[in-house]
């Protein structure tokens, strides 16, 4: 037997299995930490992977629900645990995801108590040649947020995307994406606006680009982002570039972060294909 993929949500796994059954392909689900989908007839692997890519691109397509109705599995018979809010947060987020979220919250509280300027003197991108060897500054600008909406928006996306990467690909992969995107998006942004900027959005855009393209090119990675969300990200970049909402946005960081994420996903998916 060959394991095709794993789903965090058992209902999503059942929908894919039901659809493949209507196509004459029998898959089975084994429940461990996630719902693992297995194929008995390995000669059909390429066909199943191609269908999986289409499924991940639009899992809400009516044909998948229709397949579940046809197979009589709209109620999969699985019993789901009910999680309180914080338990649900823990379920998706790994240690690196949590450490970053806590660090951002601590820095945000410090900025409210001490003032933005005081904290930026310690964490901002090097604003003087004498500070260029304070290497933490090339990364800690990502920890600073200047409003409640700013930090909530970024941490929500960080938890959603970063948590998925960490759970599926490991803490090391999330750390690498975070460090590279923080460094390069910060470098580009300081060329646009100088050193006085902050926020996790460059890293968030890198994760958006990475999760979307890695899911498109390597469905077996187990991560994906709906195309509508990546389109939203592009619209947001355009809106920020033309100042359509009258908001101060780190446009350089957004563009650089997205480019970094796409580039890393392309390389990783290429390497994954070579290993097959």
From Swiss-Prot:
Gene Ontology biological process terms from the UniProt entry:
proteolysis
Q: How does it sit in the membrane?
A: Multi-pass membrane protein
State the reactions this protein catalyses.
Cleaves type-1 transmembrane domains using a catalytic dyad composed of serine and histidine that are contributed by different transmembrane domains
Q: Which Pfam families match?
A: Rhomboid, Rhomboid_N
Task: List the GO molecular function terms.
Answer: serine-type endopeptidase activity
Question: Where located?
Answer: Cell inner membrane
Per the UniProt record, which EC number(s) apply here?
A: 3.4.21.105
Nucleotide-binding keyword on record: no
Keywords for this protein? Cell inner membrane, Cell membrane, Hydrolase, Membrane, Protease, Serine protease, Transmembrane, Transmembrane helix
**InterPro entries, sorted:** GlpG_N_sf (IPR038236), Peptidase_S54_GlpG_N (IPR022732), Peptidase_S54_rhomboid_dom (IPR022764), Rhomboid-like_sf (IPR035952), Rhomboid_protease_GlpG (IPR023662)
Q: Where is the active site?
A: 201 (nucleophile), 254
One Gene Ontology cellular component: plasma membrane
Primary residence: membrane
Q: Which residues cross the membrane?
A: 94-114, 142-162, 169-189, 192-212, 229-249, 250-270
Q: Which domain of life is it from?
A: Bacteria
Described by its record, this protein's role is as follows: Rhomboid-type serine protease that catalyzes intramembrane proteolysis.
Entry's family note: Belongs to the peptidase S54 family.
Name assigned to this protein? Rhomboid protease GlpG
Q: Which organism is it from?
A: Escherichia coli O81 (strain ED1a)
Q: What is the lineage of its organism?
A: Bacteria, Pseudomonadati, Pseudomonadota, Gammaproteobacteria, Enterobacterales
């Amino acid at each position: 037997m060959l394991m095709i993929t794993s789903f965090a949500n058992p209902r999503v796994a059942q929908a894919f299995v039901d659809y493949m059954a209507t196509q004459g392909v029998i898959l089975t689900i084994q429940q461990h930490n996630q719902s693992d989908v297995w194929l008995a007839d390995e000669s059909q692997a390429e066909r199943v992977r191609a269908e999986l890519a289409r499924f991940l691109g639009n899992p809400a397509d009516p044909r998948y629900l229709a397949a579940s109705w046809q197979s009589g599995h709209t109620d999969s018979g699985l019993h789901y645990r009910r999680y309180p809010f914080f338990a649900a947060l823990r379920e998706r987020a790994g240690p690196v995801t949590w450490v970053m979220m806590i660090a951002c919250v601590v820095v945000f509280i410090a900025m409210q108590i001490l003032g933005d300027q005081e904290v930026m003197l310690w964490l901002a991108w090097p604003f003087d040649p004498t500070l260029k060897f304070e290497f933490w500054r090339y990364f800690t600008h990502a920890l600073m947020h200047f409003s409640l909406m700013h930090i909530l928006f970024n941490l929500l996306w960080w938890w959603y995307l970063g948590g998925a990467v960490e759970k599926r690909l490991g803490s090391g992969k999330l750390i690498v994406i975070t460090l590279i995107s923080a460094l390069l998006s910060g470098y580009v942004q300081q060329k646009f606006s100088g050193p006085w900027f902050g926020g996790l959005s460059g890293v968030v855009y890198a994760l958006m680009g990475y999760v979307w393209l890695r899911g498109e090119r390597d469905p077996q990675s187990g991560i994906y982002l709906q195309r509508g969300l990546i389109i939203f990200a592009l619209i947001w970049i355009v809106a920020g570039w033309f100042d359509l909402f009258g908001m101060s946005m780190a446009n350089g960081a957004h563009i650089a972060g997205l480019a970094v994420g796409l580039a890393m996903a392309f390389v990783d998916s290429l390497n994954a294909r070579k290993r097959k």
